[in-house]
Amino acid sequence: MQAHADYIAQPQSVASQAARFSTMGVNDLQKAAKAGQAGAQFYLGTHYQYGKDVAKDEKQAFAWFKAAADQGLSPAQLNVGRMYADGIGVKKDESMARKYFEKAASNGDNRASYNLAMMEEQKKNYMGAYQWYELSTRDGMLDNKVISLSEGKKTALAANLTQEQIRTARDRADKWIQAQ
């Protein structure tokens, strides 16, 4: 799934911390990350991901993103899902990718819903794909580019679905949102 290669996500849910961590030097980030601060773990992951002030190391990037993801930081959950999906810094694992995408989607990240939709579409589960594309147009942290892409995908998928299947997919999307 190389569509996931551009996997940097900005930690929108920790905006107050973001400015502080985004400007910290690597040594300070490492101290804060080791102290368990999810925002610092996320930004340290980006340093390793791109080789900014450290040697590029995708395994270290994955480890720090996962530490932040496991504390509930949705942009980190999205990154971990994408890294599992593509086998970047970790062995490729579709079920783990799905797990982390679902966590990020449950936190309202429509980019994660979009990734889940693409996974379903690759499996030719068009109703499931439609459901996730539908969710990606109305999840909490809305990315306008994702909304536009999702609307186009829904239109294309509708050609392969009956009106009843589309209604069912939308109903499932509604139920998924209500369950969150």
Regions found by a protein language model. Name each.
Residues 21, 34-38, 50-52, 57, ...:
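Short helix-capping/linker turns of helical repeat alpha-solenoids
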Residues 145-180:
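Terminal, low-structured helical/coil segments at or just beyond the last alpha-helical repeat
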Residues 98-99, 106, 111, 120-121, ...:
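Alpha-helical protein-protein interaction scaffolds
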Residues 43-50, 79-86, 113-122, 136, ...:
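Hydrophobic face of amphipathic alpha-helices that form TPR/SEL1-like repeat modules
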Residues 1-35:
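N-terminal leader/linker segments that initiate helical-solenoid repeat arrays
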